[in-house]
Amino acid sequence: MPTLVNGPRRDSTEGFDTDIITLPRFIIEHQKQFKNATGDFTLVLNALQFAFKFVSHTIRRAELVNLVGLAGASNFTGDQQKKLDVLGDEIFINAMRASGIIKVLVSEEQEDLIVFPTNTGSYAVCCDPIDGSSNLDAGVSVGTIASIFRLLPDSSGTINDVLRCGKEMVAACYAMYGSSTHLVLTLGDGVDGFTLDTNLGEFILTHPNLRIPPQKAIYSINEGNTLYWNETIRTFIEKVKQPQADNNNKPFSARYVGSMVADVHRTFLYGGLFAYPCDKKSPNGKLRLLYEAFPMAFLMEQAGGKAVNDRGERILDLVPSHIHDKSSIWLGSSGEIDKFLDHIGKSQ
C-alpha cells in the first residue's frame, strides 16, 4: 500500500531541517491565495530572484575578474559609474526582458525608462541594480533595491505607469550582498526575509514575518554633512545625543555604514532610525523616490515602522514628476520617527 502524506509538515531529525521553504515555494503558496491568478506576478518575482543571484555571484568574483574600479563615466543622476554598476544594469535589463512579462523597467543607470515591446505582461519594475557600489573596493556590503507596479489599465507601457503615488506599489524588495546574500520582500501583506543557500542555489525563508522593534535608541545618519543641514535637522540630531528618559538616561547610539541597504537592513533587525535629509549640497534630497525611497518605505511600513520626509510627509503619499526624482527620508521604528515628527511639529 502507498504511504499517503498530507496535513502538517513532518518533524526533521537531529536538528536538520528537510522541509525548508524556498522562495519559489513561498511565491507559489502566495499565488494560491488568488483564484484568478495568471502566474504573471510569479514570473516577475522569478526574474528578479535570478537577477539577484547573478549579481551576488558577480560581486563575489569582482576582484578576481577586474570588475572593481571606475568605468570612466557617470550615470544620469551624476554618480560615478563603477564597472559593476554597468554590468549590474545589463544583468537587470536582460533578466527583465527575458521574463516575457515585465513591460517597463526603470534603472538608476539609464536616463529614460525602458519599454520591452514584445513582452506581454502588465508589470513595471524600478530598480537600483547595485546600490552603494562606491563601497565595493573596501568590501562593504552593497545591495539591490526594487519596486514593482502593475501597469495602468489598457496601458502598453509608458512613463505614467511609474510616475505614481508610492502606495500604488504591489511589491518591493531589496537584496543585500555581504557575508551572505539576504533578500527582504513584501508583497503587501507583511515582510519576509530570505537567505541565499549557495549550495542549493535557492533563497531560503529565514526571517518569516519580519517586524521592526517599535523603539530603539539607535540613529544612522552621515554626520559628515552636519555643516550643510538646516537648523531643524541639526538640533534634532544634537537632541538624540543627549540622555534619553526612555533609554535609562542614555543617549542614542550611532551606527552608520554608508551603504543604504546595509544601514536599513540593520535598522530592520535591531530598530532605530535611518535618515538622509536634504542639505545645501542636495536641496531636494539624495535618494531617488522610485527605486530607493519608495521600496524602503513600503517595506518599513509593512514591518510596522514609519517613513517620512524632512517635512513629515509620508513617503508613500508622494508622487514623482520624473523617474529620477529625489527625496529626503527618515525611516525606522515608529517610536523614533514619532520623536522626529514631534520635533518638527508634525505629530501623528
UniProtKB/Swiss-Prot annotation:
Pro/N-degron, short sequence motif: residues: 2-5
Pathway listed: Carbohydrate biosynthesis; gluconeogenesis
Listed cofactors: Mg(2+)
Any GO BP annotation: fructose 6-phosphate metabolic process
Positions annotated to bind AMP: 27-31, 38-42, 122-123, 150
Family named by the database record: Belongs to the FBPase class 1 family.
Listed name of the protein: Fructose-1,6-bisphosphatase
Natural source organism: Saccharomyces cerevisiae (strain ATCC 204508 / S288c)
The gene coding this protein: FBP1
